[in-house]
C-alpha cells in the first residue's frame, strides 16, 4: 500500500478542500478510463495516482478544464461531421 503525504499536493493546489475536489475529479477520470495516468501506476488506486500527479504538478483544475474543453470541441466537430454526412 502506498503512503501519500498530501502536504506537497496542498501547496500545489492552495488548500485541502480544493485538493480533495481536484483529486476526486482526477481519480474519477482515471477510474472511468477517460485518461491515462501521468505517473507510473505501481498497482495504486486511482486516488493515490491522482494525489501523486497533483504533488508532481502534472495535474490541476486548469489543466483538467482545458482537457475537457478540448474533448468537448472534438466531440462537437465529430458530431458536425456526422450530420454533414447524413445531410449530404
Curated annotation (Swiss-Prot):
Keywords, comma-separated and alphabetical: DNA-directed RNA polymerase, Nucleotidyltransferase, Transcription, Transferase
Q: Which residues cross the membrane?
A: none
Gene Ontology process terms (BP): DNA-templated transcription
Signal peptide region: none
For this protein, the record's InterPro entries field holds:
DNA-dir_RNA_pol_omega, Pol_omega/Rpo6/RPB6, RPB6/omega-like_sf
What are the recorded GO MF terms, alphabetically?
DNA binding; DNA-directed RNA polymerase activity
Q: Give the CC-aspect GO terms.
A: DNA-directed RNA polymerase complex
Q: Which reaction does it catalyse?
A: RNA(n) + a ribonucleoside 5'-triphosphate = RNA(n+1) + diphosphate
Protein family per UniProt: Belongs to the RNA polymerase subunit omega family.
Q: NCBIfam families, per this entry?
A: rpoZ
Subunit record text: The RNAP catalytic core consists of 2 alpha, 1 beta, 1 beta' and 1 omega subunit. When a sigma factor is associated with the core the holoenzyme is formed, which can initiate transcription.
Q: What is this protein called?
A: DNA-directed RNA polymerase subunit omega
Amino acid at each position: 500500500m502506498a503512503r501519500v503525504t498530501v502536504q506537497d499536493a496542498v501547496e500545489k493546489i492552495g488548500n485541502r478542500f480544493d485538493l480533495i475536489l481536484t483529486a476526486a475529479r482526477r481519480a474519477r477520470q482515471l477510474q472511468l478510463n477517460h485518461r491515462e495516468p501521468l505517473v507510473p501506476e505501481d498497482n495504486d488506486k486511482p486516488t493515490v495516482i491522482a494525489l501523486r500527479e497533483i504533488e508532481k504538478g502534472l495535474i490541476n483544475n486548469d489543466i483538467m478544464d482545458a482537457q475537457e474543453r478540448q474533448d468537448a470541441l472534438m466531440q462537437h466537430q465529430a458530431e458536425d461531421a456526422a450530420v454533414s454526412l447524413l445531410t449530404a
